[in-house]
Design a protein with these regions (language model features):
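Domain-level signature for soluble enzymes in the chorismate/prephenate branch of the shikimate pathway
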Residues: 1-235
Length: 235
């Protein structure tokens, strides 16, 4: 078993990775770090671009290469992940199908790269959360970055009361805590109810933030603290 796992949670062009964020609600792991990775997509297959009519990849990758796909009139087939789509192409062994994935994935499966850099925007980054079974304060990553500025991630849902969401959001203003992200996702267990995902600057170990989180807990029907971790800047 590994000490850490890495989960893609959002992309700078296509937004949040829904499956990953849904998983964070139930997974019993602490967020102990974040990584920003520059995404460079390649068209991979055994045929030439002129022969290809269908392309496989994860929905996020297909969305990030929308312009290239439209310009070449390609049909799209969603797959579970980008690396998995390379295996599909290898197994199909047809010159009219290709996939979108990384150059590294092409090398692993021994499939040629037809064209590199097919993403719509060069400013294409995916943010990953680093997850660990260890608590935040015990993780090696947190110890190595003990002096860094911190960020905390939480998930909560609100009660069905007028102004319930406002009562939570106003606490961040009251305590002068800077929000870096807020968004909602449907609750998979109850129709038309939502979970809210919030990132904010500061540590859950700070006494003021502890006090704020207690107030948020009192105004929410569900609260999960994913963890506190060092803030990472994009180079």
């Amino acid at each position: 078993t590994s000490d850490y796992s890495v989960l893609p949670v959002e992309n700078s062009l296509e937004g949040s990775v829904g499956e990953s964020n849904d998983l964070l609600v139930t997974v019993n792991l602490d967020a102990v770090g974040e990584i920003y990775h520059r995404i460079r997509h390649c068209l991979i297959g055994i045929g030439s671009l002129e022969n290809i009519d269908t392309v496989y990849s994860h929905t996020q990758a297909l969305g990030q290469c929308r312009k290239f796909i439209q310009e070449n009139s390609l049909k799209t087939v969603p797959s579970y992940d980008t690396a998995g789509s390379v295996k599909i192409i290898k197994d199909l062994n047809k010159n009219n199908v290709a996939c979108i994935a990384s150059k590294n994935a092409a090398e692993i499966f021994g499939i040629p790269v037809i064209k590199q850099g097919i993403e719509d925007n060069r400013n294409n980054y995916t943010r990953f959360l680093v997850l660990s079974k260890e608590s935040n304060e015990d993780s090696l990553m947190s110890k190595q970055n003990a002096s860094s500025k911190k960020k905390t991630s939480i998930i909560f849902s609100v009660k069905h009361e007028a102004g319930a969401l406002y009562q939570i959001i106003k606490e961040f203003a009251t305590y002068k805590i800077n929000l870096t992200k807020i968004e909602s996702r449907p609750n998979k267990n109850t129709a038309w109810e939502y979970n809210f995902y919030v990132d904010f600057e500061g540590s859950q170990d700070d006494s003021m933030i502890k006090e704020m989180l207690q107030k948020i807990k009192g105004n929410s029907s569900f609260l999960k603290i994913l963890g506190t971790y060092p803030i990472t800047n994009i180079d």
